[in-house]
Amino acid sequence: MPRLGVAVSLVGSLLLGGCMQATLAPSSNANLTPRDRQLLAHPPYAQATIAEQYQRHVVDYARREQPGTILVDTDARYLYYVLPGGKAIRYGVAVGEEAMAFSGVATVGRMAEWPDWIPTREIQERLGPYPSRVAGGPANPLGARALYLYQGSKDTLFRIHGTNQPEYIGQAISSGCIRMTNNDVIDLFDHVKTGTTVVVLPPGNQSTFAGPFTGRRI
């Protein structure tokens, strides 16, 4: 996917004085649909243990994005959903090459539950062969949900989606966009709507949280 020439206005900063306060967000199955429960009950992949720093947390947030905005920090392998009151939900993500090739501001133009996956010609040549279309389900690389990012009416080809390889959360990988665990992408999906603003920081940005990781489980 070509790099889009869209500059990100890095207003504010993620630098905080002192420690970053983080609270481990409770995991709940209350937002799962009957189909989610059925498809996630026996996934065709090994259950992964996600390192605590990449588990879902509510954190302090010092930038100036408005509540309801998504911010993606590809370097740190985090995605933030901005809440009111200087807080955000922080999710750990896996970052593919396609994600590293995009930075800028976009909006969520389409949302899908258990989306089908249509491998591109480049993916077929590099990693295939795959079927021309892979039906939605736990074996599908797009996972339980997908957010399709647009700039105006143009599809950027950048996606935020679930995964059938949760063991890679917190890592850079060879292909794909922004991958989240299926439970996390379902949680994010339930917060956002079509038109939600998404800010993707460029690789090498210096806007990262400072200070030791602190928090408590709830």
Where do the language-model regions lie?
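N-terminal pre-domains immediately preceding structured catalytic cores
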Residues: 2-218
